[in-house]
Structure formats: structure tokens, C-alpha cells
């Protein structure tokens, strides 16, 4: 193993000098271990990743944790390989950092556990699956209007407190319960408190045993935040490639991945591009996104929470992400204020899969008719606010009448929210969802009260609820 010495420390960037002919490759992991000799020194166990070659004998590296206590002259060891993290069953139910070290105070990962490098090429063309297959989530509004594709990439937009986390938990729960699938959650540059809450909520709702979690939070150096998404993806790829699973991969938040890359780029002395972002923005995003795909054996479907800086959708970071997305799920605060959960905006959410060739003619027609009805209702709201319902034509009154029932029927109770609502969660198969909305559009349930449609699963539950309300069904 080649040994070198620290010659310069600039915050999270460390320059290391090696002997001639022993220069480590780009992306290699280097280790610095140092025992404190007195009270003034600190114990150091630091991993660096090679980013640049400077001349014949020096490398510039990015630190994966704090560089406190590092001094020039300290010994550095080249591991001869990129950062490698544990994969397989040992990762389920556990929480890791960017290096694949457990941070949940649980037992150590066995030394003989398989480890994979976090840097690897995307699957080859001949390995990719060309079939477009829908991933059934059991969540009506998603399955009907913006369906997810196996191996696809979904953008999850929403401000604070509109239900992103609950939606993520329900997806993890439904994939585990209905499909027996595995989920991997990568917390990239978000609040430590949120990660802690998510871990405990998952423990309480019982989905943690089907989930591996990786965190590189806001307080960590940019190197860790930039690589933690790759750590999570490597764990997800193992379940896809070796076990043939359909894996759900969550990234919260993909913007922080770009932000960390921008910080690293500036520290490495690269010339910034538009809005101060790194010149390699599209390449870095592509290297991550191209690995998220369906192969002949399994799939990795990713759901990426996207923070939009200053609500500017033309900002290079979100704009680069959009180019890779197959579907978007937009959460709307107005809907959550109305008590409609999940607060998914049925008109703003989109999916490439909503076409007759993929979902079938009936599903497509019902979905489009639902959107048309809701759009017309939205247009009529101003008139209703100023003149009242009485001024509408009979036809428009019927549209409003049905649109309100559709709006409420797009809500449902979640399994993971049972402890708060006291109501059992519901998983609705796509066929049942399409049938329910088709019958509402046909006017079959015009006589039932609006409240009967709120927070229920299948259409049969609406009839049952109306019966309990004393309505003649």
C-alpha cells in the first residue's frame, strides 16, 4: 500500500504528496489514522477521496468528515480502491453514514460482509429493460393521474409541512407489504432532526426492517453530502442486480447533492458556470441518474424530493434534474388546508406513463375526464365566489357537484398515519381506482353526500359510509 504525507489543508480539501510512481487513482479512498499523544491533539480517523492530480507526485482530495486536528506531515495510506460500503441483508433496518459505517448505535457490520465500491458504471444498453411497466402504489391519486414507472425517476415537489415525509413512508410501507420490496432512503444534506424523526417513525410504523437508510446531513462537509447519494444507490443496486428485486430509492433532497457538488467544485478551484454552479453539473447529475434504471433482472425506481431555490424553476439545479424525470408528484398546500390527504395536486402532477399504450384506453380516458372536470371546476370557482352557485347553468352545477366528489375521493387514509387518525389505511389496486372514478363520472353516486367520499379507499367504502350517515343508497 502506497503511503504519502499531508502537505496542505484548506478546510475540507487536503493535498497529499506520494513517492514518485505511487500516485493513487482518481476516486481512490485514502485513510489517515492518528492517535492523540497529548490533551491538545485529537484522535483522527479520516477518509479522503482523490479528486485531482497535481503534478507527478501530489493529489488533491476531498475529506468525508471533519479535518479538525489535521496537520502537515501526517501519514496517509492509499487503500487502492474507491470508498466501499456494505450491501445486502445486513443493511436492512440499519442507518449508515457515507462510508457505510452504522450510526444507529447498533451492532457492527460483520467483517466478512460483502462491500461494493460506490463508483461504478451505469448498466450497459443490452442489460436495460425496454418494457414500460407501471409500479402500482395503492395511492389512488398517484396511480390514476400520474402513475410511476418501474425503474423510473419521480420528482416530489412540496413546501414544508404539506406531507412529503408521510407520502414517502406510505410508499415504503406499500412496496414492502404488497410487493415484498426493499426501500433505500438517502438523506442528502437535510436536517438531522428530520432524519432522526423519520427513523423513529419508521420504527413505530414497522417498515424499518425492509429499509436501509443512509445519511449525510447539513452539518457534514460537502464531500460527504456529495457522495451519500451514491452510497445509497450502491446498496439499492445490489438488491436489483443480485436479488432481482424492484427497489424504491428515495433521495431527500436532490438539490443538496448539486449544492454539495458546487461547494466542492469551488474548493478545487474550478471556474464556476451559470449562477455559480459547477461546470460539471450536468455530468455529475447524469452519472447518478443513469444508474437508476430497470434491467432485465430488476429495477431501481427513485423518488427524489426537489427543493426549488426561491421557487425559480429555471435555476440550473432543478432544471438539470427535470431533464431526467419520468413523472412529477406536486404537493399543494391549499389541498392540505382543506383536509385532503395526500395533498397531491391532480392538475399539476404529470407522468410520461399516462398514455393509452401504457396504462390502457379505459384508464387513460377516465384520468383525462377527471382532469377536465377538475379543471372546469377550478375555472368556475371565481364565478362561485362572486355570484354564488345559483348563477351557474345546470350543466356547470353538475360539473361542480361531481368535481367536489372527485376531489374528496382522491383522498385516502394512510397505513403509516393510523396512529394519528385512528382510521385504518387503505391500499387500492389500480383497477378498483379506475372503476370508482368511472362510476362517479357516470353520475352513479350523484345522490350520495360529499362527506361520504372523504378519506376512503374503494368506492364500496363510500356506499358503506353513506349508509352509516343514514342516506338511502
From Swiss-Prot:
Record's GO cellular component terms: plasma membrane; proton-transporting ATP synthase complex
Listed Gene3D superfamilies: 2.40.10.170, Bovine Mitochondrial F1-atpase, Atp Synthase Beta Chain, Chain D, domain 3 (1.10.1140.10), P-loop containing nucleotide triphosphate hydrolases (3.40.50.300)
Keyword Translocase: yes
Subunit structure as annotated in this protein's UniProt entry: F-type ATPases have 2 components, CF(1) - the catalytic core - and CF(0) - the membrane proton channel. CF(1) has five subunits: alpha(3), beta(3), gamma(1), delta(1), epsilon(1). CF(0) has three main subunits: a(1), b(2) and c(9-12). The alpha and beta chains form an alternating ring which encloses part of the gamma chain. CF(1) is attached to CF(0) by a central stalk formed by the gamma and epsilon chains, while a peripheral stalk is formed by the delta and b chains.
Keyword Methyltransferase assigned: no
Main localization category: membrane
Keywords linked to the UniProt accession: ATP synthesis, ATP-binding, Cell membrane, CF(1), Hydrogen ion transport, Ion transport, Membrane, Nucleotide-binding, Translocase, Transport
Binding site for ATP: 158-165
UniProt-recorded name of the protein: ATP synthase subunit beta
Gene behind the chain: atpD
UniProt cross-references to NCBIfam families, sorted A to Z: atpD
Organism expressing this protein natively: Anoxybacillus flavithermus (strain DSM 21510 / WK1)
PROSITE patterns, A to Z: ATPASE_ALPHA_BETA
Highest taxon of the lineage: Bacteria
UniProt subcellular location: Cell membrane
